[in-house]
């Protein structure tokens, strides 16, 4: 839910460490590990030392949680924790709808400084960290998982270990472009047509300014309705600088420009009265070409380019 800044995921967390107190005496070659699951694993975890690791960006209680524990005869311990929960995420929509988001789970040690407990990962952990083959996120293409160590500051100038596992996803822009960007760009034609539909002959405008102003006011209500619809569906777009906000601002600016031009030239004939009808006709001709060119260049500059990766097979 990008509007709420959360996502729901099932995360498999694997932790491995060595505890010499759990090593068995005598020959250990071929001796299988002690395996515990669910309630038995939780009971055994209360009897041994387990690193105080939490998913720090988890929101609320987990919808599902299950443990698996293996204690090897040489003292190595492997803990598997599968959890389904909501996680907080910072959504960046600056490049909407060609944006990428990082869906991350923060694995952090709480209450113990990094000098005593640290989190490390190697190639086997990187190979283990991948999206499920059954993973499906409607409207998004699923990329790869990245692991990054990022300790967090704690009390008394100490740090606590943290590893961030992030899944890169890219928005599929097809539906968004059709439902938002095509109407936004099409609405820019309304103020341009309100300028282009008029013309001067013998120093007089051929279309009454009142009719063109009606077109502009109708376009204003259309943009307001589109604005309300978009922000109701994508609340996250209402804040910050993004392409949608820029195009809405350009629409309002173009409508205001068209309204000013029609009142200034068509209603009051300011230049014709101040100078001559010829001066007004030439000035209006320049505006007929300058405004569409400026609007087109600005709209093109506001629209981000697409950089979409292929989904994971």
Question: Which residue stretches match the model-derived regions?
Answer:
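Soluble non-transmembrane domains of integral membrane proteins
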Residues: 1-166
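Generic detector of bulky aromatic hydrophobic side chains
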Residues: 17, 47-49, 90, 140, ...
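Weak global preference for isoleucine
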Residues: 28, 48, 114, 126, ...
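C-terminal ends of transmembrane alpha-helices
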Residues: 118, 156-157, 228, 299-303
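Channel- or pocket-lining gating/hinge segments that regulate access to a cavity or pore
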Residues: 163-291
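Hydrophobic core of alpha-helical transmembrane segments in multi-pass integral membrane proteins
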Residues: 286-302
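Juxtamembrane boundary at the C-terminal end of a transmembrane helix
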Residues: 299-313
């Amino acid at each position: 839910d990008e509007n709420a800044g959360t996502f729901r995921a099932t995360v498999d967390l694997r932790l491995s460490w060595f505890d010499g107190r759990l090593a068995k005496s005598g020959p250990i070659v071929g001796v299988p590990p002690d395996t515990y699951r669910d309630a038995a694993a939780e009971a055994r975890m209360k009897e041994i030392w387990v690193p105080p690791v939490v998913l720090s960006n988890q929101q609320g209680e987990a919808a599902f949680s299950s443990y698996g524990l293996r204690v090897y005869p040489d003292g190595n311990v492997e803990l598997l924790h599968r959890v389904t929960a909501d996680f907080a995420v910072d959504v960046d929509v600056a490049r909407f709808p060609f944006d990428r988001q990082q869906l991350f789970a923060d694995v952090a040690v709480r209450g113990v400084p990094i000098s005593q407990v640290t989190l490390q990962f190697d190639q086997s952990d990187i190979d283990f960290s991948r999206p499920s083959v059954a993973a499906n996120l409607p409207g998004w293409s699923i990329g790869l998982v990245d692991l990054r160590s990022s300790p967090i500051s704690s009390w008394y100038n100490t740090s606590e270990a943290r590893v961030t596992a992030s899944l890169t996803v890219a928005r599929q822009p097809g539906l968004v472009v059709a439902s938002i960007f095509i109407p936004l760009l099409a609405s820019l034609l309304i103020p341009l047509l309100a300028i282009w539909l008029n013309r001067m002959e013998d120093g007089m405008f051929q279309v009454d300014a009142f009719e063109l102003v009606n077109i502009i006011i109708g376009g204003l209500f259309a943009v307001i309705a589109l604005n309300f619809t978009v922000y109701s569906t994508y609340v996250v777009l209402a804040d910050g600088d993004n392409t949608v906000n820029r195009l809405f601002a350009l629409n309002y600016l173009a409508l205001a420009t068209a309204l000013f031009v029609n009142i200034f030239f068509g209603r009051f004939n300011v230049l014709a009265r101040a100078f001559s009808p010829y001066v007004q006709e030439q000035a209006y001709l320049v505006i007929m070409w300058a405004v569409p060119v400026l609007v087109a260049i600005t709209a093109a500059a506001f629209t981000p380019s697409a950089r979409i990766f292929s989904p994971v097979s």
